[in-house]
């Protein structure tokens, strides 16, 4: 005697004028919207565009539905290709019959196409989408309740589901284990675990999605053992049970492969999106030229127009790729000391000996000085990198007389 039971809906279709609205399809649609909403919020929290969730859903949902239907038809061929089956029922998806494994495989393929198209990491997106996906599955399971299908063994528990006579597998037995309710509750627990783990622990890329697969398949394993609907078996076990075992082991193996808390292959942008690394502030580009102030202080005011042109070029105009003076180069502006030159009175005058302030009579030297004044790069640095011709030095002074050209024999 059953004292209490969960009643089943009297019908699973609501007509909005001439348009039939099936509760099974409505549950799927609501689940998709919830998944997109949750995924979008998680992407925004990672510094990514929340609209990426919608863009990927445009690809993942159709592929997921097709994959789910294909898996169901392949795993239960007698209902469509058997003696009492009808091949045309294959396309009647509104009557129910979607395999979750096909949905995951097809949806993953569609998501892969979308992420590849938009240049997004599939593993990174999967981690963000995992809690939303499992919530969508929890909502979608109520479609089985509206269709009065995929329930468990006969039961007299107070939370057993009551099935109408035309949908009963065992004639005369009206109450069964509500496997749809069990899976819904299990999925909600998994969603909570994923959110807590993701908040308290920084897993490597793709690991949160693997954890979702492992937890879901573990729950699906014991739920499948309660079902009594017709299904193909291998070694006395339903095909879905074997699938759950294989997929669960594969997910656990994927979790164990990478032991480091952070995937070393993560780019800086992905680390910042995951919250592993903080965004670096934009650093001001400041180039310090050694010896610039000293040289300007030591150079006489009568150094000539070339010196004035150089003084008009500030240190900010120095090419950061070429850098400052080269300490190893004796012709560098920052490394050449001032030379002591005796004057007519016997005193010693300090004369700057940098190549850029010397007055030369040759065209090549003048061109080099003009280039230095234009680009703001010291001549010594240009010489050390082969960008300018090194000027000959005599006794620490720059000679104003060009060297004699060798006579050809």
Swiss-Prot record:
<keyword id="KW-0808">Transferase</keyword>
<dbReference type="GO" id="GO:0005886">
    <property type="term" value="C:plasma membrane"/>
</dbReference>
<comment type="function">
    <text>Catalyzes the transfer of the diacylglyceryl group from phosphatidylglycerol to the sulfhydryl group of the N-terminal cysteine of a prolipoprotein, the first step in the formation of mature lipoproteins.</text>
</comment>
<feature type="compositionally biased region" description="Low complexity">
    <location>
        <begin position="297"/>
        <end position="309"/>
    </location>
</feature>
<comment type="similarity">
    <text>Belongs to the Lgt family.</text>
</comment>
<feature type="region of interest" description="Disordered">
    <location>
        <begin position="273"/>
        <end position="409"/>
    </location>
</feature>
<dbReference type="GO" id="GO:0042158">
    <property type="term" value="P:lipoprotein biosynthetic process"/>
</dbReference>
<feature type="transmembrane region" description="Helical">
    <location>
        <begin position="93"/>
        <end position="113"/>
    </location>
</feature>
<protein>
    <recommendedName>
        <fullName>Phosphatidylglycerol--prolipoprotein diacylglyceryl transferase</fullName>
        <ecNumber>2.5.1.145</ecNumber>
    </recommendedName>
</protein>
<dbReference type="GO" id="GO:0008961">
    <property type="term" value="F:phosphatidylglycerol-prolipoprotein diacylglyceryl transferase activity"/>
</dbReference>
<comment type="pathway">
    <text>Protein modification; lipoprotein biosynthesis (diacylglyceryl transfer).</text>
</comment>
<feature type="transmembrane region" description="Helical">
    <location>
        <begin position="48"/>
        <end position="68"/>
    </location>
</feature>
<keyword id="KW-1133">Transmembrane helix</keyword>
<feature type="transmembrane region" description="Helical">
    <location>
        <begin position="234"/>
        <end position="254"/>
    </location>
</feature>
<feature type="compositionally biased region" description="Low complexity">
    <location>
        <begin position="348"/>
        <end position="375"/>
    </location>
</feature>
<keyword id="KW-1003">Cell membrane</keyword>
<feature type="transmembrane region" description="Helical">
    <location>
        <begin position="177"/>
        <end position="197"/>
    </location>
</feature>
<feature type="compositionally biased region" description="Low complexity">
    <location>
        <begin position="320"/>
        <end position="335"/>
    </location>
</feature>
<feature type="transmembrane region" description="Helical">
    <location>
        <begin position="119"/>
        <end position="139"/>
    </location>
</feature>
<dbReference type="InterPro" id="IPR001640">
    <property type="entry name" value="Lgt"/>
</dbReference>
<keyword id="KW-0472">Membrane</keyword>
<feature type="binding site">
    <location>
        <position position="141"/>
    </location>
    <ligand>
        <name>a 1,2-diacyl-sn-glycero-3-phospho-(1'-sn-glycerol)</name>
    </ligand>
</feature>
<dbReference type="Pfam" id="PF01790">
    <property type="entry name" value="LGT"/>
</dbReference>
<keyword id="KW-0812">Transmembrane</keyword>
<feature type="transmembrane region" description="Helical">
    <location>
        <begin position="18"/>
        <end position="38"/>
    </location>
</feature>
């Amino acid at each position: 005697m059953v004292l209490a039971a969960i009643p089943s809906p009297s019908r699973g279709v609501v007509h909005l004028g001439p348009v039939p609205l099936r509760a099974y399809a409505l549950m799927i649609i609501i689940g998709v919207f919830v998944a997109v909403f949750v995924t979008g919020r998680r992407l925004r929290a990672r510094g990514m565009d929340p609209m990426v969730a919608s863009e990927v859903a445009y690809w993942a949902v159709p592929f997921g539905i097709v994959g789910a239907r294909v898996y169901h038809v392949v795993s239960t061929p007698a209902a469509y290709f058997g003696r009492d089956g009808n091949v045309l029922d294959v396309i009647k998806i509104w009557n129910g019959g979607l395999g979750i494994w096909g949905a995951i495989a097809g949806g993953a393929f569609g998501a892969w196409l979308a992420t590849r198209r938009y240049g997004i990491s599939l593993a990174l997106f999967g981690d963000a989408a995992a809690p939303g996906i499992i919530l969508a599955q929890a909502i979608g399971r109520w479609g089985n309740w509206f269709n009065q299908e995929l329930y468990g063994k006969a039961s007299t528990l107070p939370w057993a589901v009551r099935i109408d006579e035309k949908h009963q597998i065992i004639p005369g037995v009206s109450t069964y284990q509500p496997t749809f309710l069990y899976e819904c509750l299990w999925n909600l627990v998994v969603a909570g675990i994923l959110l807590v783990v993701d908040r308290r622990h920084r897993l490597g890329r793709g690991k949160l999605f693997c954890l979702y697969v492992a937890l879901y398949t573990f729950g699906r394993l014991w739920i499948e053992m309660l079902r009594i609907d017709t299904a193909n078996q291998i070694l006395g076990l339903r095909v879905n049970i074997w699938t759950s075992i294989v997929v669960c082991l594969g997910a656990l193996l994927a979790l164990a492969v990478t032991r480091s808390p952070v995937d070393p292959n993560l780019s800086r942008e992905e680390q910042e999106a995951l919250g592993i690394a903080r965004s670096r502030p934009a650093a001001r580009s400041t180039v310090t030229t050694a010896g610039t102030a000293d040289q300007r202080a030591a150079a006489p005011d009568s150094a000539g127009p070339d010196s004035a042109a150089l003084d008009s070029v500030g240190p900010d105009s120095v090419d950061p790729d070429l850098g400052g003076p080269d300490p190893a180069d004796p012709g560098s502006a920052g490394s050449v000391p001032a030379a002591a030159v005796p004057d007519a009175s016997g005193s010693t005058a300090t004369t700057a000996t940098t190549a850029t302030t010397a007055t030369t009579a040759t065209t090549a030297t003048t061109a080099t000085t003009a280039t230095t004044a234009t680009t703001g790069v010291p001549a010594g640095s240009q010489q050390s990198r082969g960008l300018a011709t090194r000027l000959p030095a005599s006794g620490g002074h720059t000679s104003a007389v060009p060297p004699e050209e060798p006579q050809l024999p």
